Regions:
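Short, Lys/Arg-enriched N-terminal segments with co-localized hydrophobic residues
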Residues: 1-3
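Alpha-helical substrate-recognition element adjacent to the catalytic core
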Residues: 5-166, 170-171
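Short, surface-exposed amphipathic charged segments that create phosphate/polyanion-binding patches used
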Residues: 172-188
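Conserved Lys-Pro-Asp/Glu-containing loop-to-beta segment of HAD-superfamily phosphomonoesterases
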Residues: 186-204
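Short, flexible loop segments at the rims of nucleotide/cofactor-binding pockets, characterized by
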Residues: 102-108, 185-192
Length: 204
């Protein structure tokens, strides 16, 4: 998504499956040795989500026009909400350093290094502003990954801000409380319409 504002290009990017080759939520999810002994493995939550998603898709029925597609995207929010509320406890007691240790496992899209260089040139000439808008669970993870990738490619990290959900932490600590909250004081970004709303807010 891109638009021109005051002769400067505003570039709004997705993260999972766009900048990266694959979804990165499995890297944000804690390893078995990082969770409480009685916590289920992340795959259990993935299976429960897929059951909810499949049931919702079946009940919604076939999509034959644009209005039905918009309704589908709005309605699926309840599936995403249920999934996040279910998974909250999985992150309790984990920290950013643990997630940061898995950044090296991210596979970026071919051409991303060249894209970083292109963005850095245009930001330096004040002709570009770039942001990420994502349904991901950790803006800190994304920000750390972008910085590490830019350093590896020898360019400056110029994406101004990552608008994504965040794992809440205890005051004065990076220890996670278990809650997943929206960016800043905003509601959580869970669906396509949520992302569109955020993009419009950034562009306004």
């Amino acid at each position: 998504y891109a638009t021109m504002t005051s002769r400067r290009l505003l570039l709004l990017l997705d993260w999972d499956g766009t900048i990266t080759q694959h979804d990165t939520l499995n890297l944000i999810a804690p390893a078995l040795n990082e969770v409480k002994s009685d916590s289920p493995d992340f795959s259990v939550y993935q299976d429960e989500y897929m059951r909810d998603y499949t049931e919702f898709k079946t009940m919604f029925g076939q999509i034959t026009n644009r209005e039905q597609m918009y309704d589908y995207l709005r309605s699926i929010r309840m599936v995403e909400e249920r999934s996040l509320n279910r998974i909250n406890c999985l992150f309790e007691g984990t920290n950013d350093a643990q997630r940061r240790s898995r950044i090296g496992k991210i596979c970026y899209r071919k051409g991303w290094a060249a894209m970083q260089y292109w963005m850095a040139q245009r930001v330096a000439s004040h002709t570009l502003a770039a942001y990420i808008v994502s349904v991901n669970w950790s803006r800190t993870f994304i920000s750390d990954a972008l910085k590490a990738c830019a350093e590896q490619n020898g360019v400056e990290q110029v994406i101004s801000y990552v608008y994504a959900n965040e794992l809440a932490t205890k005051p004065g600590s990076d220890e996670c409380t278990g809650l997943i909250q929206g960016p800043g004081q905003r509601e959580r970004i869970l669906t396509g319409p949520d992302k569109v709303k955020m993009c419009e807010a950034i562009a306004s």
